[in-house]
C-alpha cells in the first residue's frame, strides 16, 4: 500500500521532514568529505554492527560501508542512504557499541499522539537504577506534532522516533509503520486503548495528546 511504501522509504519522507531530521544523501557522489556519518538502508540498518557497518568517520569509510551493505541480502534491495551523524545525549552503549541515547518512540494516528515511551527498553531498568531514566519532554512532543503536520495525509498509523542532541535540540530520527514497529517502553494499555478509540470514533481524540 502507498502509505506503507511512503513511511518505509527514508527518501520518500525525507523531503517532507528534512528541516527536522539529519541531513541525508542518497547518492555517494553527493556526500561531503568530512563526517562523521551514519550509513544504512532506506528502511533498515545493521545496528548490530554499529562500529563497522553503520558509523563512518568520513566519506571514504561511508563509501566502504555502502559497498558492503550493497551486498547485504536485505539492505541491497532498499538502496543505501548516508546521513549526517548527530551526537546525541548518551547514557550507555549496547553490545555493538551503539550509543544508548535520550530517544523516545511515539505511536500516532491521523496526526494525533496516541502514546509514547523511552526507546531503549532493554536499558530501562539499569537507567532507572542509576537515576538517569529520562522524562518526557514538551519540546519533543511539539516536534512530533510538527512532523505529523508535515506528513499529513501520507500515512495514518505511524511511529515517530525522536532524540535529543548534545546541544539540547530535539530531532526526528526515523519514521516507521505503526503496524510493524516494536513498542519499546510505550505503555501498551494506553496505546491500544487510544488506538481503539481513534479507529472506532475519530472524534474522541480531541486533544493532540490523550
Which residues make up each language-model segment?
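A short linear hydrophobic-aromatic micro-motif
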Residues: 38, 157-160
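Short acidic-glycine loop/turn motifs at beta-strand connectors
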Residues: 108-112, 165-168
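Short solvent-exposed loop/turn micro-motifs enriched in small/polar/acidic residues
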Residues: 98-101, 153-157
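Short, surface-exposed charged micro-motifs
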Residues: 103-105, 159-161
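C-terminal active-site "lid" helix and adjoining low-complexity regulatory extension at the edge
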Residues: 138, 150-155, 164-210
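Active-site nucleotide/adenylate-binding loops and adjacent lid/helix of ATP-dependent enzymes
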Residues: 2-103, 110, 115-116, 120-146
Amino acid at each position: 500500500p502507498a502509505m506503507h511504501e511512503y513511511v518505509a522509504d527514508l527518501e520518500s519522507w525525507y523531503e517532507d521532514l528534512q528541516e527536522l531530521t539529519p541531513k541525508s544523501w542518497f547518492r555517494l557522489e553527493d556526500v561531503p568529505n568530512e563526517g562523521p556519518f551514519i550509513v544504512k538502508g532506506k528502511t533498515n540498518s545493521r545496528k548490530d554492527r554499529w562500529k563497522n557497518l553503520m558509523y563512518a568517520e568520513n566519506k571514504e569509510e561511508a563509501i566502504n560501508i555502502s559497498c558492503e551493505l550493497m551486498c547485504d541480502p536485505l539492505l541491497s534491495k532498499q538502496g543505501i542512504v548516508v546521513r549526517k551523524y548527530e551526537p546525541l545525549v548518551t547514557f550507555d552503549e549496547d553490545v555493538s557499541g551503539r550509543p544508548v541515547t535520550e530517544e523516545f518512540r511515539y505511536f500516532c494516528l491521523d496526526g494525533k499522539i496516541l502514546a509514547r515511551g523511552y526507546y531503549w527498553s532493554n536499558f530501562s531498568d539499569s537507567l532507572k537504577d542509576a537515576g538517569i531514566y529520562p522524562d518526557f519532554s514538551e519540546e519533543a512532543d511539539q516536534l512530533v506534532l510538527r512532523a505529523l503536520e508535515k506528513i499529513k495525509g501520507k500515512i495514518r498509523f505511524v511511529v515517530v522516533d525522536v532524540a535529543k542532541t548534545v546541544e539540547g535540540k530535539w530531532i526526528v530520527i526515523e519514521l516507521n509503520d505503526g503496524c510493524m514497529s516494536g513498542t519499546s517502553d510505550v505503555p501498551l494499555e494506553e496505546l491500544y486503548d487510544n488506538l481503539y478509540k481513534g479507529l472506532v470514533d475519530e472524534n474522541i481524540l480531541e486533544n493532540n495528546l490523550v
